[in-house]
Every structure is written in C-alpha cells, then in structure tokens.
Amino acid sequence: IAHWNLWTWLNNLIPLAETEQKEQFKEALAACLEEFEPTFIEHYTTGLCKKMGLPHFHKDSTECGLSFLRILQTEQLDYTQSFIRLQNKEYKVLRDDCLDIRQFDAFLTQYENIREHQDTDELDANMQEANPIYILRNHMAQRAIEAAERDDFSEVDRLFKLLNHPYTRQPDLEKPEDLGPLPSDVPDVAVSCSS
C-alpha cells in the first residue's frame, strides 16, 4: 500500500515538471521507487525483530516474526498486549489465548531456538524499547472526552502523563482498562479517520 501511495503521489508531481524535463523526471521518480521497496522491507524486518526480541541477522528471525503476526491475526489477539506478553515471557498466557495450540507451539519452539545462543539481555532491551505498554485506545479517549465535556480535565491530564512514557510501567497512573482492549461484552467506541 505504501509503495502504491508513493507511486501515485510521485506521478502527480510529473505535470509540475517542465515539458522538456518530464522524461528525466519520470526516470528519477522510477529510480526512487526502485529504492523504496528494499529499504522499506529492511526497516520493517528490523523493527519486527526488535519487537520480537530476535536478532535481525538470524536467517529465521523474519519468518518467526511473521509467524507470530499470523497467530495474532488468526486468533484475533490484541497486538500490543501480545507483544508485551512475549516480552514478559508469559508464554502460557499467550498459548492459553490460542485455539490452534499446535501453531503456537511450533512458533514458540522456533522462537526459543533462535534466541537460545544469543545475547538475550540485549534482545530483551530491544523489545522493551520497541513495545509500548500503553497506547491510546478508543475507549480511553472517549472516557477523557466525556469527562472534558463536563469540564473535568483530570482524565485528559492522566492520559497525557501516562502516554508521555508509554514504555515504562506506571502503576500509580494506570487503570486496568488501560492495559488492553475492553472485554467483549462492553461495546467499543467506533471512530473514523476523520474523528
């Protein structure tokens, strides 16, 4: 999607070029696009490996990371909380959340095999830098908005402080509902891109 968006945006720039320079401009844009995909993939896989606590140079790290993402999608698990559980080595909790136990067990075996002979202190530090504990969720924002509409800005202030340091546990500021999605029996707040 990012590649297509960039291609579309760059093609909209072509009419801005002088007539005699349009071919050169098109060639320059094509060269930029050729560099985009490998650069994007490199940054994406590096980021994924950091989130997973895996060494980027290991031949199986990217596939292991993609396997975990497939599990999150298939099992409809919370992305943020699943990465925090992986970071905290809460493998049993993650496993218990899965219907396809064999898929999770295969992932975990591969994951542990990759990490087995690595400097896990460094990899764990990478995970902590890449996985926020707190993210602004719709229900959190809605709660703050509703309070602010009543001229009570305490929730806005609390969220501002909490989200200012999303990678650090803040038990004095957090509420249980800050740590994950609402339970399925509580209606979620739907928002649009223009909200």
Describe the residue ranges of each PLM region:
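Regulatory N- and C-terminal appendages and interdomain linkers associated
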Residues: 1-195
